[in-house]
Amino acid sequence: MNVFRLSGDLSHLAAIIILLLKIWKSRSCAGISGKSQLLFALVFTTRYLDLLTSFISLYNTSMKVIYIGCAYATVYLIYMKFKATYDGNHDTFRVEFLVVPVGGLSVLVNHDFSPLEILWTFSIYLESVAILPQLFMISKTGEAETITTHYLFFLGLYRALYLFNWIWRYSFEGFFDLIAIVAGVVQTILYCDFFYLYVTKVLKGKKLSLPA
């Protein structure tokens, strides 16, 4: 494992922990897109079905279990425990416009036409756009809480670091996964505007708000 993958995994884990702590400590999921969290839960479920068929390492298995567990814990907090605080009026992105095309693309473009491989490919494509409901929600409300922006920053950082991981693996291992790289580039691009606002506003102590 190289430093970029490890840093990416830690950034991803930090994002998940920040979100869970934000919801639990505030006893509220206001400003959080439940639809994005449902998509992430679907991403991890379809990606890590290999937990049932293979073992790579204790680290690999542990991280997969943590991601799946935290994803469903987040969904539970939003839709069950703190349902009264969920802002469904602003969380209105039509997720079928993501899931259906991604499902079709994963059947057409994959590494191997087998159930597990198609589901893995589906998860890669879906993860690249799963944050869109959250970004759409922020665009509708016009602002985001600081802690929510920290969550989004670490989530975007995780994906950016994974791009460097792919570059490192190609340079030193000769490994090249076009599907993962293209999806990662798309996902990173979606965060570009947010990164700019995060650096120019949030890191200077200002609240992230979008221009009217």
Curated annotation (Swiss-Prot):
GO terms for cellular component: COPI-coated vesicle membrane; endoplasmic reticulum membrane; Golgi membrane; membrane. The record marks R5, S54, E117 as: Interaction with the K-D-E-L motif on target proteins. It is a multi-pass membrane protein. Residues 47-48, 159-169 are annotated as: Interaction with the K-D-E-L motif on target proteins. Residues 1-4, 53-58, 111-116, 169-178 are lumenal. Residues 204-207 are annotated as: Important for recycling of cargo proteins with the sequence motif K-D-E-L from the Golgi to the endoplasmic reticulum. One of its GO terms (molecular function) is KDEL sequence binding. Keywords: Cytoplasmic vesicle, Endoplasmic reticulum, ER-Golgi transport, Golgi apparatus, Membrane, Protein transport, Receptor, Transmembrane, Transmembrane helix, Transport. Residues 25-32, 80-92, 136-149, 200-212 are cytoplasmic. It holds the Pfam family ER_lumen_recept. GO terms for biological process: protein retention in ER lumen; protein transport; retrograde vesicle-mediated transport, Golgi to endoplasmic reticulum. The chain crosses the membrane at residues 5-24, 33-52, 59-79, 93-110, 117-135, 150-168, 179-199. It comes from the Eukaryota. It is found in: Endoplasmic reticulum membrane; Golgi apparatus membrane; Cytoplasmic vesicle, COPI-coated vesicle membrane. Belongs to the ERD2 family. Receptor for the C-terminal sequence motif K-D-E-L that is present on endoplasmic reticulum resident proteins and that mediates their recycling from the Golgi back to the endoplasmic reticulum. Binding is pH dependent, and is optimal at pH 5-5.4. PANTHER family: ER LUMEN PROTEIN RETAINING RECEPTOR. Binds the C-terminal sequence motif K-D-E-L in a hydrophilic cavity between the transmembrane domains. This triggers a conformation change that exposes a Lys-rich patch on the cytosolic surface of the protein. This patch mediates recycling from the Golgi to the endoplasmic reticulum, probably via COPI vesicles. This is ER lumen protein-retaining receptor 2. It comes from Xenopus tropicalis.
